[in-house]
Amino acid sequence: MWQLVSSTALLLLVSAGTQAADVPKAVVVLEPKWNRVLTMDSVTLKCQGDHLLRDNYTWLHNGRPISNQISTYIIKNASIKNSGEYRCQTDQSKLSDPVQLEVHTGWLLLQVPRLVFQEGELIQLKCHSWKNTPVRNVQYFQNGRGKKFFYNNSEYHIPAATSEHNGSYFCRGIIGKKNESSEAVNIIIQGSSLPSTSLLLSHWPQIPFSLVMALLFAVDTGLYFAVQRDLRSSMGNLKNSKVIWSQGS
């Protein structure tokens, strides 16, 4: 009886754990994908997550609610005050991880999707100009050395990142008759030998589930062998027992 109650309790624990794990996080997506923009740029943030047709969306900027209840939040003319951390949530999903938006001033800005990459990943760099003003003779630099030159402004792609791509990057180009340069950004390349923290965290609900299932299997297996042992013992006692007949019976 105790084993049956324990198995039932464990099954209820598994059910509750899987239901909690089934609620996904919402995700904030930037369009365009760059999280570093210039003043007057337009930026669209999209909240992706499980939702019903009439669900409301909750947006937070630096922890404060935004009066926006739809899936997209549009910044038409970005200013410094739009910089900061953005998060979103739907009625059917948990609060998203934060996405950082940086609004800068200047003629040129080196844009990159993020500053930390894993070995083997694609790195995309863009020399972005204020109000998309035409730029020519664009050159990308790493640690002060020229790496790529374009007569017309183009993105610079590094197909597979290695440790050699660690360092400080900036771009330079001619706008009108002036030679302009962007501020430098530091890019870090991490080794790929160990899984990332986010990858480990994404699988954490499966770990206790696996342990509980293994425990259930062990309990059931133990009960099976215990019953088999008792049956063999009973059969053996029956065979070895002597039956005494009395004439009067």
Swiss-Prot record:
Main subcellular location of this protein, as a coarse class: membrane
PROSITE patterns the record matches: IG_LIKE
Cytoplasmic topological domain residue ranges: 228-249
Record has 4Fe-4S as a keyword: no
GO CC annotation, single: external side of plasma membrane
Transmembrane segments: 207-227
Signal peptide annotation: 1-20
Positions bearing carbohydrate: N56, N77, N152, N166, N179
Complexes and interactors: Forms a heterooligomeric complex with ITAM-containing signaling subunits FCER1G. Interacts (via transmembrane domain) with signaling subunits; this interaction is a prerequisite for receptor complex expression on the cell surface and intracellular signal transduction. Binds the Fc region of antigen-complexed IgG.
Function: Receptor for the invariable Fc fragment of immunoglobulin gamma (IgG). Optimally activated upon binding of clustered antigen-IgG complexes displayed on cell surfaces, triggers lysis of antibody-coated cells, a process known as antibody-dependent cellular cytotoxicity (ADCC). Does not bind free monomeric IgG, thus avoiding inappropriate effector cell activation in the absence of antigenic trigger. Mediates IgG effector functions on natural killer (NK) cells.
Protein's name in the database: Low affinity immunoglobulin gamma Fc region receptor III-A
Organism: Canis lupus familiaris (Dog)
Phylogenetic lineage: Eukaryota, Metazoa, Chordata, Craniata, Vertebrata
